[in-house]
Curated annotation (Swiss-Prot):
Transmembrane segments: 15-35, 187-207, 281-301
Task performed by this protein: Catalyzes the second of the four reactions of the long-chain fatty acids elongation cycle. This endoplasmic reticulum-bound enzymatic process, allows the addition of two carbons to the chain of long- and very long-chain fatty acids/VLCFAs per cycle. This enzyme has a 3-ketoacyl-CoA reductase activity, reducing 3-ketoacyl-CoA to 3-hydroxyacyl-CoA, within each cycle of fatty acid elongation. Thereby, it may participate in the production of VLCFAs of different chain lengths that are involved in multiple biological processes as precursors of membrane lipids and lipid mediators.
Organismal lineage: Eukaryota, Metazoa, Chordata, Craniata, Vertebrata
Active site location: Y207
Name of the molecule in the record: Very-long-chain 3-oxoacyl-CoA reductase-B
Originating species: Xenopus laevis
Binding-site residues for NADP(+), renumbered to this chain: 54-83
Family, per entry: Belongs to the short-chain dehydrogenases/reductases (SDR) family. 17-beta-HSD 3 subfamily.
Example of a GO cellular component annotation carried by this entry: endoplasmic reticulum membrane
Membrane topology: Multi-pass membrane protein
GO function terms (MF aspect): estradiol 17-beta-dehydrogenase [NAD(P)+] activity; oxidoreductase activity; very-long-chain 3-oxoacyl-CoA reductase activity
Record EC number: 1.1.1.330, 1.1.1.62
The reaction(s) this protein catalyses: a very-long-chain (3R)-3-hydroxyacyl-CoA + NADP(+) = a very-long-chain 3-oxoacyl-CoA + NADPH + H(+); 17beta-estradiol + NAD(+) = estrone + NADH + H(+); 17beta-estradiol + NADP(+) = estrone + NADPH + H(+)
């Protein structure tokens, strides 16, 4: 004899309640994401970042791309700028431009982060007695083109440089600047990671791993020192129109460095881990919440194999 209602089916009520619980959970999660997104991307102002937390900002990799944009935006907000990069000529040019345009003080320190034993004592001396409110650890290098690990040109030297520039510079610069921030009970450390550090990226494996380190280091450090007034933020951009990314023309999803940095600074104090820019945040949420890591790795492999093939074909033709 057939049951007269679904309630008479054994276990039906359990499935119904489970469905209600699941739907409620997903609804609450979606609502939280929307509210949090509005808090960050609509209400965020970046008011925390400026001369009230310290007269000086220090920016590594400050003469190009995102680093240059951070230096100029922080100068626009009234902070004096210490620019650290490899080329003395480009540093002089950037310092003069910032000083004339924004009417702030500038200081330059020429340093090759790929040769760490030669630079940190000199950087420490150059930063001595400065009231540093913001440190932007931006300097970084990537591959010339996607490549299998053992086939990376000049592999041993490339590994040393990438680890020294992408990882050691972040640790050492933080070591130099953080004590002064703790002494004043305020400061902001912005560590520029990459969306490539959100999951493994085949054929950019070492670069991806170094950026994952920056992300983990930043979030751990923030937990250690936030109660003492220091904010540490991990910034994970997707593509930005820079020389490093080999993108010349900005688009809505590949913004100029200036557009990206203005947006990213508005998230300071609101997110300890940020993609920095609304279209990037949406992409980041999709790629980490909806796409399985295994699928993201497979897509990265397929994309980079294509880029590798095109690069090698072009190199062979030349």
């Amino acid at each position: 004899m057939a049951p007269e209602s679904l309630a008479e089916v054994p276990g039906c009520n359990c499935f119904w309640y489970l469905g209600v619980v699941a739907a409620t959970w997903w609804g609450l999660r979606a609502a939280w994401c929307l509210l949090n997104g509005a808090r960050v991307w609509v209400l965020g102002s970046g008011a925390q970042v400026g001369p009230t937390i310290g007269k000086w900002a220090v920016v590594t990799g400050a003469t190009d791309g995102i680093g240059k944009a951070y230096a100029e935006e922080l100068a626009r907000r009234g902070m004096n700028i210490v620019l650290i990069s490899r080329s003395p000529e480009k540093l002089e040019e950037a310092a003069i431009h910032i000083k004339q345009k924004f009417k702030v003080e500038t200081k330059i320190i020429a340093a090759d982060f790929g040769k760490p034993t030669e630079i940190y004592e000199r950087i420490e001396a150059g930063l001595r007695d400065l009231e540093i409110g913001v440190l932007v650890n931006n300097v970084g290098i990537s591959y010339e083109y996607p490549e299998y690990f053992l086939e990376i040109p000049d592999l041993e030297n490339t590994l040393d440089k990438m680890i020294n520039i992408n990882i050691m510079s972040v640790c050492q610069m933080t070591r130099l600047v953080l004590p002064g921030m703790l002494g004043r009970g305020k400061g902001v450390v912005l560590n520029i990671s990459s969306a490539s550090g959100m999951y493994p990226v085949p054929l950019l494996t070492v670069y991806s791993a170094t950026k994952a380190f920056v992300d983990f280091f930043s979030r751990g450090l923030h937990a250690e020192y936030r109660s003492k007034g220091v904010t540490v933020q991990s910034v994970l951009p997707f593509f930005v129109a820079t020389k490093l990314a080999k993108i010349r023309k900005p688009t809505w999803d590949k913004p100029s460095p200036e557009t990206y940095v203005r947006s990213a600074l508005n998230t300071v104090g609101l997110q300890t881990q940020t993609n920095g820019y609304l279209p990037h945040a949406i992409t980041g949420w999709i790629s980490t919440s909806l796409v399985p890591v295994s699928a993201a790795i497979s897509m990265g492999m397929k994309m980079n194999k294509g880029l590798r093939a095109r690069f090698l074909k072009k190199a062979k033709q030349n």
